[in-house]
Regions:
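Short, conserved alpha-helix that lines the donor NDP-sugar binding/gating region
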Residues: 1
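Conserved catalytic core of nucleotide-sugar-dependent glycosyltransferases
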Residues: 15-90
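Histidine (H) residue identity feature
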Residues: 41, 53, 63, 111, ...
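Short beta-strand-to-loop acidic/aromatic patch adjacent to the donor-nucleotide binding site
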Residues: 4-15
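Short, well-ordered beta-to-alpha junction loops that form the rim of enzyme active sites
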Residues: 11-12, 19, 103-105
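Catalytic core and acceptor-binding pocket of nucleotide-sugar-dependent glycosyltransferases
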Residues: 65-140
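Hydrophobic beta-strand segments of well-ordered beta-sheets in folded domains
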Residues: 7, 31-34, 96-100
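C-terminal, non-catalytic tails of nucleotide-sugar-dependent glycosyltransferases
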Residues: 94, 98-102, 124-186
Length: 186
């Protein structure tokens, strides 16, 4: 690997939906790190608390070769989030860096967290490799009195339907257009 090579980390249930080479080249001229923005937590509604999420992280190889980023990528920080990727926050702060946050750009939201498009570049299913209950679902259950297990079952059913569409060569474009607000479901 060369120092100026771009390293891209991508979750197993995320994939590009548009060319992103030029976008990353441009952003990495200004920012040392490009990442999806962590969705807000129920205990932290501060929109200025931007947490890089590992479903998508891009940076130049020099940060691994000479700047110790590898150690920070696997560091669990003990704060209100206790996440294993929290070390990136420390890495950014210690160096005075800011990152470019990819933000959710869906126009149609089937769920407040799942089935997300970020900056019209990346699709993230969010439910591909974990339990089907989320922070927004727990808030919903608390506010409505619904059973969390019923919400998880509903999430699983919708996830299966969406996954079938995004894994279909004939339907993926329609699904992405729908989530972007460019296509009406019939």
């Amino acid at each position: 690997v060369k120092k100026d090579d771009t390293i891209l980390l991508l979750d197993s249930d995320a994939f590009p939906i548009a060319p992103m080479g030029d976008f990353l080249d441009e952003k990495l001229k200004t920012y040392p790190f490009v990442s999806a923005q962590e969705p807000m937590h129920e205990w932290d509604r501060d929109p200025l608390y931007l947490i890089p999420h590992p479903m998508f992280m891009a940076f130049k190889a020099i940060h691994i070769l000479e700047d110790n980023l590898t150690d920070y990528l696997r560091e669990i920080i003990k704060d209100k989030n206790d996440n294993w990727w929290g070390g990136t926050i420390n890495w950014l702060k210690e160096r005075g860096y800011y990152y470019y946050p990819l933000t959710r750009s869906n126009k149609a939201d089937l769920h407040p967290l799942y089935y997300a498009i970020y900056d019209d570049l990346i699709y993230h299913h969010w439910a591909g490799s974990r339990n089907m209950i989320t922070r927004p679902d727990r808030i919903r259950a608390q506010e409505t009195g619904e059973n969390v297990d019923d919400i998880a079952k509903e999430n699983h059913e919708v996830s299966s339907q969406v996954f079938e569409r995004v894994s279909s060569e004939t339907d993926i474009d329609n699904m992405m257009a729908y989530l972007k607000g460019e296509y009406e479901e019939s």
